[in-house]
Structure formats: C-alpha cells, structure tokens
Amino acid sequence: MNGQNIRIRLKAFDHRILDASTREIVSTAKRTGANVRGPIPLPTRIEKFTVNRSPHIDKKSREQFEMRTHKRLLDIVDPTPQTVDALMKLDLSAGVDVEIKL
C-alpha cells in the first residue's frame, strides 16, 4: 500500500478506555512495521443540559448535567498489508467509536 495513509478517529465518553484503545492500535501498527503519527488529542466536546429540580414549582432551582466526548486522531503512514489485517482483527473496548478513512 504505497503512499497511502490510514486516518483513525476515536471517540468515547471515558478517556481511560479511549487511551487504552489508542495504545492498543499504536502497538499493533508499530509491531507490523508501519509508522504512526499521534495520538493527537482533539478538543473535548462538552454538552450541558439544564433541567428544573422540581417538577412543579421553583424555577430558580436548577440542576446541570454534562456529557463529555473525548476524541483522538491517529495517522498510520505507509501501512503494510499485515498492518491492515491486524487492525481488522483488533478487538477494542465497548464504548469506543472508531472511524477509519483510507
């Protein structure tokens, strides 16, 4: 696969699971002889939701919830066919969203 790059974008709510998955992908790619750029941490997306604490009265009493989406970017430069096979067979943790672009 001469001159090609594989771009892997990972998303998760828990940064520990995300970092473990990126370490697993990087070690697999390096073991099969590919060069890896990254992991590059992308900005964390924070969604905040504000709701009333009481269902009936008291508009001034509110509660906030937030959802954080952590993201990482990996570039695999000049992957070998063994790299692609190893990445396809890789079993990552549940809760990690993986997007792959060739």
From Swiss-Prot:
Residue ranges crossing the lipid bilayer per the database entry: none
Gene Ontology molecular functions: structural constituent of ribosome; tRNA binding
Cellular component, GO annotation: ribonucleoprotein complex; ribosome
InterPro entries on file: Ribosomal_uS10, Ribosomal_uS10_CS, Ribosomal_uS10_dom, Ribosomal_uS10_dom_sf
Top-level taxon: Bacteria
Keywords: Ribonucleoprotein, Ribosomal protein
Signal peptide span: none
GO BP field: translation
PANTHER family xrefs: 30S RIBOSOMAL PROTEIN S10 FAMILY MEMBER
Function: Involved in the binding of tRNA to the ribosomes.
Family membership: Belongs to the universal ribosomal protein uS10 family.
Assembly and oligomerization: Part of the 30S ribosomal subunit.
Protein name in UniProt: Small ribosomal subunit protein uS10
Species of provenance: Brucella anthropi (strain ATCC 49188 / DSM 6882 / CCUG 24695 / JCM 21032 / LMG 3331 / NBRC 15819 / NCTC 12168 / Alc 37)
Primary gene name: rpsJ
